[in-house]
Amino acid sequence: MKQIKLKEPKNGSELVLETLLELGIDTVFGYPGGAVLPLYDAIYNFKGIRHILGRHEQGCLHEAEGYAKSTGKLGVAIVTSGPGATNAITGIADAMSDSVPLLVFTGQVARAGIGKDAFQEADIVGITMPITKYNYQVRETADIPRIITEAVHIATTGRPGPVVIDLPKDVSALETDFIYSPEVNLPSYQPTLVPNDMQIKKILKQLSKAKKPVLLAGGGISYAEASKELNEFAERYQIPVVTSLLGQGTIATSHPLFLGMGGMHGSFAANIAMTETDFMISIGCRFDDRLTGNPKTFAKNAKVAHIDIDPAEIGKIISADIPVVGDAKKALQMLLAEPTVHNNTEKWIEKVTKDKNRVRSYDKKERVVQPQAVIERIGELTNGDAIVVTDVGQHQMWAAQYYPYQNERQLVTSGGLGTMGFGVPAAIGAKIANPEKEVILFVGDGGYQMTNQEMAILNIYKVPIKVIMLNNHSLGMVRQWQEAFYDGRTSESVFDTLPDFQLMAQAYGVKSYKFDDPETIVQDLEVLKEDIPMFIEVDISRKEHVLPMVPAGKSNHEMLGVKFHA
């Protein structure tokens, strides 16, 4: 077993940093406090790891998420004990929902004070048990390198997810020898990566019989970096592709086989195809309720093959006729390696293409700036190549529907948990991880006010993201549901008074603009070409709805607001 032993003893905090460095980690996001002072003292003179100081622990977690989601690398965050750790809970839960590889260090009171209601003590191991892939509390300083190495392995392998390491203050201050081994010995944790060969053959056998096959591409395609294989498989067998929200970008929106995003705010063609298919091949998708609608009627006439790296997801919501446990990339490679089977989807492709082309995207209006048009214009200005980050709400769905995605990991959003406040810090994390890429953030006036303090980072760390606020002076998605299902009673969803967002941005040293003229908006958005941190507020109508929409509990074919060409 390979080991590295340094001559001089190190304290626990130095062990943390040395181990992270050995594991190739060079960036962490954090916020100091009493229980992590030894760790921050070690950071002061440590070379090789960059620390980004957030402005709130939730922001630090979302920054780490944006870093991880946009790259596939591990995101790392450090917070203190008690309120610092509890402030991080939302980010940890968000990462768990979306399978984001995170390593979160939480400070803890000294071992002698644990369980005695010490100042700033919280049982973070107990609190995070349901929302982490695994968690640790370090009891001995010498265990730090092993625990971190295991934690990184767990967070980044199999189905990725967050791992918490609770670090008592005295453990981080005591000295010991630094003995590091890159090897991990976890007999009880052995994720299945290679699918069963017989199950792969069953998929192809069923495909040869299918007249109306559909590929459903989820976020697992991005995590496995399997977009190339997905496209090759779809093209070989001429299978139309539907994506989940997190699967956006796994196939280019311009690809003739792409039908759109499926589900509650999915496209007409995608939802009808999922309803009428006779064979669905789902890859890296967990069939959440926003995608399936009524699970009893979802793909009701179809045989279903479900490929997922997490066996717990298979059969949990939609029964699988052909269950396949394994890595999405490996599964697709095995499907492609098999002899090509004969299938004929010509009539099916003709039908779904007709469905795709018969729908109008949205009604063009002259008197108001339309959010759809803003997103389309930004797609043109960025050549469809920007990393798009969103907060949560109507703007999130419009960004999913109207930006021309081309690549995996191009859309960074909060899918499973739907966390308002995700946007600003996640965009910061994405830009720090991808300094050469354009990062565009779409955010609403509601979500922006939850974490806008992170805007302080933009000039301090030279992070030139472009913040596009689509301001409808309300909690737009809440208001939309109230108008649709609560007889228009917009209870507490309309903001009668707002801060001056221009002055707020300027207070953080960020150049700001406000646009509200539909006649000039196309030219106005040219300012995005400037490579500086930028805040653009675009006034849009309060009346705009995200369409189509499948009401909660209804089947996917029961869409509201579909508009057809005359």
Language-model segments: residues:
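Phosphate/pyrophosphate-binding active-site segments
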Residues: K2-K7, A142, N301-Q394, L503, ...
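A general structural motif
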Residues: E57, K116-D117, Q190-K202, G262-G266, ...
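N-terminal alpha/beta PP-like core and its mobile active-site loop of ThDP/TPP-dependent enzymes
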Residues: K2-V341, R377, L381-G384, P464-V467, ...
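Well-ordered beta-strand positions enriched in small/hydrophobic/aromatic, beta-favoring residues
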Residues: G75-A77, I165, V388, L411, ...
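Active-site nucleophile and cofactor-binding loops and adjacent substrate-binding regions
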Residues: Y31-G33, I52-H62, A77-G84, R139-E140, ...
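Active-site diphosphate/adenylate-binding microenvironment
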Residues: S13-L17, L21-D26, L39-I43, T353-A430, ...
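Generic enzyme active-site microenvironment
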Residues: V164, H306, V389, F442-V443
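Thiamine diphosphate
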Residues: F119-Q120, I314-I317, P323-V325, K329-Q333, ...
